Amino acid sequence: MRINPTTSDPEVSIREKKNLGRIAQIIGPVLDVAFPPGKMPNIYNALVVKGRDTLGQEINVTCEVQQLLGNNRVRAVAMSATEGLKRGMDVVDMGSPLSVPVGGATLGRIFNVLGEPVDNLGPVDTRTTSPIHKSAPAFIELDTKLSIFETGIKVVDLLAPYRRGGKIGLFGGAGVGKTVLIMELINNIAKAHGGVSVFGGVGERTREGNDLYMEMKESGVINEQNLAESKVALVYGQMNEPPGARMRVGLTALTMAEYFRDVNEQDVLLFIDNIFRFVQAGSEVSALLGRMPSAVGYQPTLSTEMGSLQERITSTKKGSITSIQAVYVPADDLTDPAPATTFAHLDATTVLSRGLAAKGIYPAVDPLDSTSTMLQPRIVGEEHYETAQQVKQTLQRYKELQDIIAILGLDELSEEDRLTVARARKIERFLSQPFFVAEVFTGSPGKYVGLAETIRGFKLILSGEFDSLPEQAFYLVGNIDEATAKATNLEMESKLKK
């Protein structure tokens, strides 16, 4: 009796159940795959190519279906390098979009776009997974209440407050403290809100990703001894990855964040560094798929792609995802379609200033350039709004007087202007504060300052109550009581020296 090969061979029986196609064409990171008639995969389905290259090395490439071409062919974008692939190789249709691990098992770990751990710390529990392509929450699920997301960082909470479930753009060059600010926010959301964070490294330098991981371990944001106590999950798709991976890594990070929001009902911080690279990767893929380019060579689907990512970042009645996105501005041109499309989605901008960093004022957030749609009396209340406006006016006047001071000196100013300058310098220093994550380097303990304390402190400085105190007393302290205590200590020290 002859044995039926299709039932005896386990490999064949698996393929019978799964949809099987063959590679018809390879154009860099884009594959055309032919399937049997009537067995076409859906758009966004994951396809897996397994086999061996000419040297006998194992190949395992995952792709995502982007177009149905007709003649039983689909065009797919690879999520990893396509070296070693050949025409005629078997391709398995997984029957669903890419799915990644979600939940507590992801904390303290580094993943790639496919949700595979890349930190050499062993496998991750994959019993709970979620597809990366989803619709945004329905209107009925959204939380429409406007509320401030308190960060415990004075300059942010007072002058450019974040919205709970909002989107914030983080602008700043190299070396002005972007990473430290990101780490402090991750630390504070865990302590004050019982929340977790997800960091999506989209198309940035591998070295920076590694540095961030090392710094997080050093500062305790990632707990190596007990990973479950870590406060962040990391997802990296760096510069050396194919455009498909860079285009989808933001969605992988967002999917992990959505689980914490919808199932664990937590407040989540989602960091995307850098949102421009997401657009850039989409532009590369668009050209490879043969779409006609739009303005400045960008993809014609730019607004749609950006919208499908940004609309999933929101507050629901269960929890919230507050997103902080680093924005690279090509050639400092804010009218470029990529940053211009991003701005349409932002609720607040935090601008880091090299001038403040050079003065040693950290966080180096520019109080005059940073903006927020939340800074309105009906949202934050009259007291907060008035205090913020007075702080900005005082700092603006100081900025205008700086040229005169540089040429003629302080003595040539009127009495009123001299008082404004003295208060502005105190405000500038009081906007600095010691960070928890920088304790390891500075030796001074970090401070979390509540919004009410922040407003009280600045009101007292503006009222002139502390005009007699030295400005040094306001530098790197938490609330105003610490500034007065520091002033007393400075006075004692100067008396002892005499």
Curated annotation (Swiss-Prot):
Alphabetized InterPro entries for the sequence: AAA+_ATPase (IPR003593), ATP-synt_VA_C (IPR055190), ATP_synth_F1_bsu (IPR005722), ATPase_a/bsu_AS (IPR020003), ATPase_alpha/beta_chains (IPR050053), ATPase_F1/V1/A1_a/bsu_N (IPR004100), ATPase_F1/V1/A1_a/bsu_N_sf (IPR036121), ATPase_F1/V1/A1_a/bsu_nucl-bd (IPR000194)
A cellular component term, taken from the record's GO annotations: chloroplast thylakoid membrane
Molecular-function GO terms, alphabetical: ATP binding; ATP hydrolysis activity; proton-transporting ATP synthase activity, rotational mechanism
Binding site for ATP: G172, G173, A174, G175, V176, G177, K178, T179
Modified residues (Phosphothreonine): T6
One Gene Ontology term from the biological process aspect of the record: proton motive force-driven mitochondrial ATP synthesis
UniProt entry tagged with the keyword Transmembrane helix: no
This protein's UniProt keywords: ATP synthesis, ATP-binding, CF(1), Chloroplast, Hydrogen ion transport, Ion transport, Membrane, Nucleotide-binding, Phosphoprotein, Plastid, Thylakoid, Translocase, Transport
Top-level EC class: translocase
Positions where Phosphoserine occurs in the chain: S13
Protein topology in the membrane: Peripheral membrane protein
Matches recorded under SMART domains: AAA
Catalytic activity: ATP + H2O + 4 H(+)(in) = ADP + phosphate + 5 H(+)(out)
Cellular localization per UniProt: Plastid, Chloroplast thylakoid membrane
Family annotation (CDD domains): ATP-synt_F1_beta_C, ATP-synt_F1_beta_N, F1-ATPase_beta_CD
EC number: 7.1.2.2
Pfam families referenced in this protein's UniProt entry, alphabetically: ATP-synt_ab, ATP-synt_ab_N, ATP-synt_VA_C
Entry keyword annotation includes Chaperone: no
Task of the protein: Produces ATP from ADP in the presence of a proton gradient across the membrane. The catalytic sites are hosted primarily by the beta subunits.
HAMAP family: ATP_synth_beta_bact (MF_01347)
Subunit text: F-type ATPases have 2 components, CF(1) - the catalytic core - and CF(0) - the membrane proton channel. CF(1) has five subunits: alpha(3), beta(3), gamma(1), delta(1), epsilon(1). CF(0) has four main subunits: a(1), b(1), b'(1) and c(9-12).
Entry-linked NCBIfam families: atpD
Family note: Belongs to the ATPase alpha/beta chains family.
Name under which the protein is recorded: ATP synthase subunit beta, chloroplastic
Source organism per UniProt: Draba nemorosa (Woodland whitlowgrass)
Lineage: Eukaryota, Viridiplantae, Streptophyta, Embryophyta, Tracheophyta
Gene name for this UniProt entry: atpB
